[in-house]
Amino acid sequence: RLYMLEVLPIQAKIEQEAICARCGVEYDADCMAYRATIDGFLTGICQFRMSDRGGVIRDLATVQGQTLNDRDRVESLFVLGRATLNFIDLCGVHRAFFDDAAFLRDNQGLVRSIGFTPEADGRWGMDLTDFFREPCKHG
């Protein structure tokens, strides 16, 4: 079946807070966020911020209690992650980190497919320089 997956920035903090609650993550007013929907139904959120070292994904999560099939779940999260990285890169920030330890525990393969790898200090990070110039190389 065909469906429409959309990933869009969340403009209003009140909406971000409500989506965080639905996804079981702590709302952080200092973070920016993207939301994912499939056919208009909310599927997930990515909260992130800019730091002095680079962009930082704080939370990547799907709606709690939702029965998404694995493909829809993975695709929603993958596109959320990549859209966030693209925004970070477009802001001229060419380093990114993945700091959602709880998500990482059960989803290392997905985090790797988004583009992150463990660094020497144990933190998962990546260099965004030219990453989106040839995105098919990173799929």
Predicted regions and their residues:
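Conserved active-site alpha-helix within GNAT-family acetyltransferase domains
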Residues: 101-121
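Conserved GNAT acetyl-CoA-binding A-motif
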Residues: 88-101
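Conserved donor-binding loop and adjoining core beta-sheet/short helix segment
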Residues: 37-75
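Short acidic/glycine-enriched loop/turn segments that link adjacent beta-strands
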Residues: 30, 51-53, 104-105
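Short amphipathic alpha-helix that is part of the acyltransferase structural core
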Residues: 1-28, 135-139
